[in-house]
Structures are given as C-alpha cells and as structure tokens.
Amino acid sequence: MIPEKRIIRRIQSGGCAIHCQDCSISQLCIPFTLNEHELDQLDNIIERKKPIQKGQTLFKAGDELKSLYAIRSGTIKSYTITEQGDEQITGFHLAGDLVGFDAIGSGHHPSFAQALETSMVCEIPFETLDDLSGKMPNLRQQMMRLMSGEIKGDQDMILLLSKKNAEERLAAFIYNLSRRFAQRGFSPREFRLTMTRGDIGNYLGLTVETISRLLGRFQKSGMLAVKGKYITIENSDALAALAGHTRNVA
C-alpha cells in the first residue's frame, strides 16, 4: 500500500495543484529516489494541466516530442493506426505511469494517447528534463528504470499474444491490472474497468464477443464476479494460475 500523505495545495495559474513532494503516487513516478533539493528542481519544470476530458488526446502520432506526461489520476490509452486504417491499442496507462517514452528515439510520437476518463496529468518538458537529468544522477537512473519497465512490459505483451490462448490472455490482463491497482494503493480484488470490452479485445487480439463469453465463463466458475464494468476477484489462486503466475493477488 502507498502510505497516505498530507496533501498540500498551492495556488498556481489555473487553480490548485499538488506538488511532487505531496503526491501520493510519487513512488511510482519520476520523483522516486530524489532528495528534497532534487525534487524542488524537478517540481519547478513541471506544468500541471487542467483536467483532460474523456476522448481528448495528449498527443497524436507524428507530433513532435515536446513533453512527457505523468498521469496523476485517470486512465490513458495508447494506440496506433494500421495501414488498413484500423485502431490498434498498444497500452493502458494508470496513475503514476509516464506517457511518451516511445518518442525519444525519433523525436516524434509514433502513437496517439487518449483519455479513457477524466484524467489529470503533469506535463514535463522533455528538453528541460533531459538537461536536468544530466546534472542529477538519481534522476537519470530513475528515468532509465522507468524506461526499462516499459520495455519489460512490451516483452511481456509479445509473450502474451504469441504463447497464450484466449482464456490465458484475459486472465493475465485482469491479473496484471489488479497488481497495478495494488501498487497504487487501491484494492486489487475489486475495481472498475475504465476501458470498454472492445478496447480490451483490441489490445488482446480478441473479439468483443470472446471477451464477453470469457468473462461469463470466469464468473460461472467462481473465479470472478462481473457486474457491468466492475470486477471482483473471487478466487485469486485460480486467476493467478490461469494467468501463468503462482503468487496470490495481494
């Protein structure tokens, strides 16, 4: 569980903002491992935006990389458009995640980032961040850790799509989502899916009908309870086993 922190609101242009020192998800984000002086320097370059409404985009494919975005609340999906003009979802980003890493190599975003619900983000100008990280080893190391985590996630996704059947894919998706909620201090057993079943199917390479059928099967087996977008994990051992993990949902 992420310990509760006293939230200090300071007036900025545009209203109230939570600073890095007071953010409850800082352990998952860039500020982790930074000392107070380093936090102050990072805090000074961050722009805190107004809420992003459902359906709005942070950036589009082809846009020049100007900033990275740290999600404070809400859910952002990343997707590309195939040669056939179809949407292909490549990731779902939760509070504490950083969006935009995949643009560092070319200097342009290869994908779109769109809010699935009302979300709050911190905008971090990349050139300034890159310059600052050159002067702060702790910041540079944390950036590398975050990028390494994203690469590991991509590798896991390749394995998921190439080696697992439909049941195992969906079980792994729900299991991994529950672990991510746990890391953020939320319940790993009861949560709301912010993405549609169509989005989940798109991400996993399955049809909407297959997702609905499998959720019904998981519920009938007693592994899950499903009510609309709300999921309750009833048998964490069974879910972990089907997902290819041995540890219980914490």
Swiss-Prot record:
Q: Where is this region: Activating region 2A?
A: 47-50
Region Activating region 3D: start-end pairs: 112
Q: What is its main location?
A: cytoplasm
From the UniProt entry, list the residue stretches annotated as the region Activating region 3A. 60-61
Q: Where is this region: Activating region 1A?
A: 71-75
S-adenosyl-L-methionine listed as a keyword: no
Q: Which residues bind DNA?
A: 197-216
**Stretches for region Activating region 3C:** 85-87
- GO biological processes: positive regulation of DNA-templated transcription
Residues binding [4Fe-4S] cluster are C20, C23, C29, C122
One GO cellular component term noted in the UniProt record for this chain = protein-DNA complex
- HTH crp-type domain residues are 164-237
Renumbered to this chain, region (Activating region 2B) spans: 123-124
Report what the protein is called. Fumarate and nitrate reduction regulatory protein
Report the source organism: Salmonella typhimurium (strain LT2 / SGSC1412 / ATCC 700720)
